Amino acid sequence: MAVMPFSPDQIIRPEILALSAYHVPPACGMIKLDAMENPYPLPPELRDEIAKLAGETPVNRYPDPDAAALKAALREALSIPDGMDIMLGNGSDEIIQIIALACGKPGAVLMSVEPAFVMFRMIATFASMNYVGVPLHPDFSLDAEAMLAAIARYQPAVIFIAYPNNPTGNLFDAVEISRIIDAAPGVVVVDEAYHAFADASFMDKLAHHPNLLLMRTLSKLGMAGLRLGLLAGKPEWLRQLEKLRLPYNVGIVTQRIAEKLLQHRDVLLQQAAAIKLERSSMSRRLAELEGIEVFPTDANFILFRLNQDHKATQVFQELKQRGILVKNLDGAHPLLKNCLRVTVGMPDENAQFLEVLQTLLVKVEAKA
């Protein structure tokens, strides 16, 4: 009997076939200013403690499925309010996916602003939810009236709001976010991935809004390689979401090392303070360059737009050829036309980036 040819296209959902996989560019040997990581290494003595701890960790055993010790450390370090529960994820991405899967009834809508964190849209597709993106104002401020109108029209099951926003870096007006939370018929998740670099939070609002959840990650604070995200909220929400969390999703090495680093949170906060100082200096120096518009930021990155004499894609490629990797956002959304995003690195990395960028801009002007 002849065997019929088999194709995954016959089985896999068409909306998945239409997706492109999330691309992470190779960065070996480059100045890496594209992924919003903390660039500072840990002090040698702390690295030695972690190496010893890793060596003593029983990796042949499954981790604590509840990560009780780590949760206790996080509750204290992040000032989680009394009465609120915590759920941990393998990075924030897993938490976003759990929420979407839990709320993804047939025809349900997941809403966010645009431009926003790309995983909101992608995970809505993964979970068979309809995605609605509401454009920001041209200055990247929140269009609260448009959001409220979209809420009334689409009745979203889930709304994600990043605070500060990625990729724009700005903090939206807190009063307007509260209006959105009050108007939402479903759950509102405030994503505070960049909280370490901002001076605002909705953590103390959790008790005041029955439909509010708050998400954090330790990636930007210096633990990107550990992949650890956190969701805080009322127990009645988290009890349901826990049903979708896969067993042992936070590995034993991640649990042990994260606990150790939280005991030395002062080191991480000092590094965050250094990044904020560099951010101010870098924003100022970028703004001094001819042909660049720099946008306000409360994150560990800076969004800037090149004027019409320069092409963002060309500048991105030339920076890359010179060993500097930033994020090219031109084409990602109409509001991001000719925009690049640069992570705040260490002082010498930032200086090299600025020097090369200035050289490239001058070269283009000379040709004009």
From Swiss-Prot:
Enzyme nomenclature, EC number: 2.6.1.9
Known catalytic reactions: L-histidinol phosphate + 2-oxoglutarate = 3-(imidazol-4-yl)-2-oxopropyl phosphate + L-glutamate
One GO BP annotation of this record: L-histidine biosynthetic process
UniProt xrefs under SUPFAM superfamilies: PLP-dependent transferases
Cofactors named for this entry: pyridoxal 5'-phosphate
Highest taxon of source: Bacteria
Pathway stated in the Swiss-Prot or TrEMBL entry: Amino-acid biosynthesis; L-histidine biosynthesis; L-histidine from 5-phospho-alpha-D-ribose 1-diphosphate: step 7/9
GO terms of molecular function: histidinol-phosphate transaminase activity; pyridoxal phosphate binding
Keywords recorded for this protein, A-Z: Amino-acid biosynthesis, Aminotransferase, Histidine biosynthesis, Pyridoxal phosphate, Transferase
Record-linked Gene3D superfamilies: Aspartate Aminotransferase, domain 1, Type I PLP-dependent aspartate aminotransferase-like (Major domain)
Residues found modified as N6-(pyridoxal phosphate)lysine: K220
Pfam families: Aminotran_1_2
Subunit structure: Homodimer.
Similarity section: Belongs to the class-II pyridoxal-phosphate-dependent aminotransferase family. Histidinol-phosphate aminotransferase subfamily.
Protein name as annotated: Histidinol-phosphate aminotransferase 1
Taxonomic path: Bacteria, Pseudomonadati, Pseudomonadota, Betaproteobacteria, Nitrosomonadales
